[in-house]
A protein has these predicted regions:
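Acidic, glycine-rich catalytic/binding loops that coordinate metals and/or anionic ligands
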Residues: 73-120, 216-219, 229-292
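Zn2+-dependent peptidoglycan hydrolase active-site motif and core
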Residues: 164-168, 174, 181-214, 237-240
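Active-site region of chymotrypsin-like
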Residues: 28-30, 194-217, 248, 252-257, ...
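Charged- and aromatic-enriched interaction segments used to assemble
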Residues: 1-72
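A structural signal for short beta-strand/turn segments enriched in small hydrophobics and glycine
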Residues: 186, 218-230, 338
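Short, charged/polar, Gly/Pro-enriched secondary-structure boundary elements
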Residues: 67-72, 248-252, 666-669, 710
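Short glycine/threonine/proline-enriched tight-turn/helix- or strand-capping micro-motif at secondary-structure
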Residues: 112-181
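Conserved N-terminal phosphate-binding loop of PLP-dependent enzymes in the Aspartate aminotransferase
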Residues: 291-728
């Protein structure tokens, strides 16, 4: 209706700009809706409106759940569920009465324990799962109906893979010929050398695909009637059993029955976005086959509601309607429907998700010893020495204090600086984020995380100007001296007020701004001025350090600066909670004036062993170099897009900490905040997880695991290009 009226309006008034602008979007909606059969679209609409389908209602009846009268009528017009209940017996014997031996249900799902370490990406992953079951002596291996198959998940693709099977797939071990019997009564509708289709005379059909028919079309059969045979076989043979509404078969896209397609004997699959309809068109045949039902639905909405019941409103989350992530591998995340996403935001898992070395380290150490750091064990010193060895050659830092997070690390660093100087005042930069503890939050000034950040700083915190080359008081790289001079003026003013500075804290790269590099010379000059004023310099490397810059291990090395204290965390444990402060013994020993320091879990054997595994992997896998190479490729790709799309402003950062700033006008620098949010949503639809940052929420933050490949980087650039070209 919208399309027709739109075109009619343009016929009447061809200069109607509003109608011409709207017609393109309305035509897109129309084309998408008409690309599927009407029956399927109808079921999607009914599902969205909350109407329970025949199959769903019948399923409730099968489970013994009372049903409303209207649903009961629908269910009674469908399958004879009492008949199904009576057929419960030895697995698969209702179809293969001569089958002898165990039947194994194979788990090809997203949370399958046998698909770890990226095994699911192998082309023959599914076949190997079946082979493993049969090699173990099983007579049949079953891939269940309705279980989203991780084995069918493809990565770096704009469309979700077809992962949800419409039938049960049975793989039979090599052996002699089998008789095939009807598990329910019906009329033979199709009989070929590829399978049999039974009309159950109630609006439903049952297909058994991958067998040779021994019946004729029109034959009436009872439960147990021989209808086909499975020939003798030297190799594994698949047979698919599908319960489907008759009205879904005609014109179905794709064909639902395996006998309609060349890949005989295998259940057909649909993409997650089509499950709402096809779960109403099909039904789980497990009861017919006397096997366990494992049907899955996308329950992310229920999981989100469950979380909201126990979460505080202040606790952050990604996306208003988030996907439910239950697996990760390297730089990919996979949701419960088998949809894969490139993870472009997870700087916590620097090595990548599911890293075997970290998992093995945890498994081994937790079985041997895990206690607190007041006991003597070798892992603590070994890990601390490895961290110190990563410092620049001229560094005089020689002491490590381990905690459990970046917030704790910043909190401890501030306490150390105040103890060592005997002063209280701390200078932090505007628009900075440093943590959530009392002290680390006090020096956090970002309105992005706290809209009231600048209104409620304690009196011991002084906020200095942020040296943002793009949006700051001074613009361009040759502004470091000006920003440093302004900081020096702040320090002088504080001294005049009797507020001598204890510490100056800043990120070595402006992470919260989207990876904005500090102006040349700023950090070294700022450190010199702080030290001249008697203060100490804290480099917050929690986000930007640990190899992410590519050209250097630490962010402060980019500026040729040497901090007095370094805070580290996020990637240290690849998701395992580890944080720390690296400093000098002179500064660390000052803490004794305030009592003893101890962290129950900080520096325990398990944390240290994980930390060592991370460092080993970073070295053996060349991840810092990968960050340099792939990061440069990404940045070049984004800059090439900027030449074609005016919405892209500057590309910030280095290595694999980048920011793509979106602006409505490059001269005025008006932030494209709404556009950035919409683009992130559209990128998610295309299989890329990227989110916004900065005070204006208009910068796409790019900080993926350091194992990001060139192929995935190219896909991200192409996806962003597509969104900017087609719209969002």
């Amino acid at each position: 209706l919208l399309v027709a009226s739109g075109w009619r309006q343009l016929e009447i008034d061809g200069d109607n700009a509003y109608a011409r602008e709207r017609i393109a979007g309305e035509q897109t909606i129309f084309d998408a809706a008409t690309a599927l059969p009407l029956a399927e679209v109808t079921e999607h609409v009914l599902a969205a409106l909350g109407f329970v389908g025949v199959a769903e209602g019948a399923g409730l009846q099968l489970l013994g759940v009372p049903m409303p009268a209207a649903l009961k009528d629908l269910a009674e017009s469908g399958l004879n569920f009492e008949q199904l209940r009576e057929r419960r017996a030895v697995p698969l014997r209702s179809v293969f009465p001569d089958l002898a031996g165990d039947v194994v249900l194979v788990d090809p799902g997203v949370e399958s324990e046998v698909l770890e370490a990226g095994r699911w990406l192998e082309a023959d992953a599914e076949a190997r799962l079946v082979a493993d079951a049969l090699d173990g002596g099983a007579a049949a291996a079953v891939l269940p109906y309705g279980v989203y198959r991780l084995t069918r998940t493809a990565v770096d693709t704009p469309d979700a893979s077809e992962t949800w099977p419409l039938g049960t797939e049975i793989h039979l071990a090599p052996g002699d010929a089998f008789a095939v019997t009807a598990p329910v009564a019906g009329v033979v509708a199709v009989a070929t050398d590829r399978g049999v289709l039974l009309d159950l005379r109630n609006g439903w059909t049952l297909s058994i695909d991958g067998v040779q028919a021994e019946c004729a079309e029109g034959d009436e059969v009872d439960p147990g009637t021989r209808i086909a045979s499975l020939p003798a076989r030297d190799a594994t043979r698949p047979v698919a059993v599908t319960l489907c509404r008759a009205d879904a078969l005609e014109g179905a896209t794709p064909p639902i029955l395996a006998l309609d397609v060349p890949d005989e004997g295998r259940a057909q699959l649909v993409a997650p976005e089509r499950v709402a309809a096809w779960s109403r068109f099909t039904f789980d045949p497990s009861a017919l086959l006397s096997i366990e039902s494992r049907t899955q639905r996308d329950e992310s909405g229920d999981e989100q509601a469950r979380r909201e019941q126990i979460f505080a409103s202040a606790q952050e989350r990604y996306y208003d309607r988030p996907m439910q992530i239950e697996r990760g591998w390297r730089h990919h995340l996979v949701d419960t429907t088998g949809r894969a996403y490139i993870d472009m935001v997870n700087n916590v898992t620097g090595l990548g998700h599911g890293h075997a070395g970290v998992a093995d380290a945890v498994n081994r150490q937790i079985r041997i010893l895990n206690t607190n750091s007041r006991f003597l064990y070798r892992e603590l010193a070994e890990y601390s020495e490895r961290l110190l060895a990563l410092l620049p050659e001229n560094s005089d830092l020689d002491t490590v204090l381990l905690v459990n997070s970046g917030s704790e690390a910043v909190d401890l660093a501030l306490r150390l600086a105040q103890a060592a100087t005997g002063r209280k005042t701390v200078v932090s930069l505007r628009e900075a984020y440093h943590g959530w503890t009392m002290a680390s939050d006090a020096v956090t000034t970002s309105a992005y995380d706290n809209p009231y950040a600048l209104e409620n700083r304690p009196d011991w915190v002084h906020v200095a100007d942020v040296p943002n080359q793009y949006r700051g008081t001074y613009r361009g790289d040759a502004t470091g001296a000006k920003y440093a001079a302004d900081l020096g003026a702040d320090l002088d003013a504080l001294a005049t007020q009797g507020r001598d500075v204890a510490a100056f804290i800043c990120e070595s790269v402006l992470g919260n701004a989207g990876g904005v590099l500090l102006p040349e010379g700023y950090l070294a000059d700022a450190y010199a001025r702080v030290r001249a004023a008697g203060g100490l310099c804290i480099a917050d490397e929690v986000q930007v350090g640990f190899g992410r810059m590519g050209s250097s291990f630490w962010g402060f090395e980019q500026s040729g600066a040497a901090p007095d204290l370094i805070t580290i965390a996020k990637p240290m444990g690849n998701g395992f909670p580890i944080g720390g402060v690296i400093t000098s013994k002179r500064i660390a020993d000052a803490l004794s004036s305030q009592g003893q320091f101890f962290s129950s879990a900080g520096g325990n054997p398990l944390s240290c062993r994980v930390g060592l595994a991370v460092l080993d992997a970073m070295e053996s896998e060349g991840l810092q170099e990968n960050a340099r190479v792939v990061g440069a490729r990404l940045a070049d790709g984004f800059r090439a897009l900027a030449a074609r799309h005016d919405l892209i402003g500057p590309i910030h950062g280095e290595g694999l900490y980048l920011g793509v700033e979106l602006v409505r006008d490059r001269e005025s620098m008006e932030p494209a905040t709404a556009e950035a949010a919409a683009i992130c949503e559209r990128l998610r639809e295309l299989g890329v997880v990227v989110l916004t940052t900065s005070e204006r929420s208009n910068v796409l933050k790019v900080k993926p695991p350091l194992c990001l490949t060139s192929e995935s980087a190219d896909y991200v650039v192409a996806a962003l290009d597509r969104v900017l070209t087609e719209g969002w």
